[in-house]
Amino acid sequence: MSVVNKFNQKAKEYDSERRALIPCFDDFYGVAIDCIDFEKDNPKVLDLGAGTGILSQFLLEKYPNAEIVLMDLAEEMLKEAEKRFEGNDNISFICDNYLTHEFDTKFDIVISSLSIHHLTGEEKKFLIEKYADLLNDGGNFVNADQVLNPNNGVEDYFKLKLDEHTGEISEKAYEEAKIRRTYDKPSSVDFQVECLKNAGFNYIGIPYKYYVFAVFWAKK
């Protein structure tokens, strides 16, 4: 079964399990939006692998007049996002592969959360370059994602600590989350920073890290 099918199956329960599976939930998503450096109150935003729209919801708290395009390959996840943003005419949805989809417009901000780690290293490099080119001057790229520690012992220890901090969740939901992790292809912080440099970003930083979770921020 593909990763898309796995997320489609879990769409209705996805949000309710996030805080249990991500002990740093509020800081992780909150810092990803707080670090964005864009002064206008109506940015044009693209959310890659948007899922049910959690990160976009955080963004709307900072930029309530933002025009946001949510893109995801999992149709059922986007249906949940449509419910979340019902009545907001500034929100639109695209069900497609963000590696191959062609845009005829540029954006002020490109965001993503817990999606890009499903790509191979080469795909990550391609994606970052692709969307760097779609950013306006002064545009921001933010990726809140899972990362890989190059030391296997450290990586295993970090995962163990995360398991210790997992909140209340059913055994079935926990086992399903473990199965979804088998599709993960996280890359190191250093590799992804190098990808951002090669894509031409002038400013790059890691404003947040918690065990395997990290926020990448870059600005043209």
How does the language model describe each region?
Residues 144-199:
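C-terminal alpha-helical "lid/dimerization" subdomain adjacent to the S-adenosyl-L-methionine
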Residues 199-220:
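Core SAM-dependent methyltransferase catalytic element
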Residues 112-116, 144:
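Residues lining the SAM
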